Amino acid sequence: MWSFKAELEATCPGSIVEIDCKKLKNGQVYFRRMFVAIKACVDGFLAGCRPYLGVDSTHLTGKYNGQLAAATSIDGHNWMYPVAYGIFYKETKADWTWFWKQLKRAIGTPHGLTIHTDACKGLETAVHNVFQGDVEHRVF
């Protein structure tokens, strides 16, 4: 992961790659969550997409479990446009709040931004706490 972060930041300056780990008393480090927003995707969203984000997550299964969250928009051709993604263990209020803070850091608060999410526990509160009413939040 650290190599991925270093390579992405070197080849795509301005991209945001946040890796959050937990360090135990014995010195072991455990992965908690990750957020990625590639600069070209963020710039494309801000310059040419509707001020709309659809955000949802899906379960990861296999060797590593968790959630893969994605923020997508709609471009000028009405196609899905990827903006950012994150990986975390489960859909908790703390993990969603962390994801939204990283996303806001990446895109700011574009005028007229509408965010669509599902009715996941803690998600509505996290959006409100991070964007503080500056966006319209809809639940589908």
Each model region followed by its residue ranges:
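DNA-binding interface regions
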Residues: 1-140
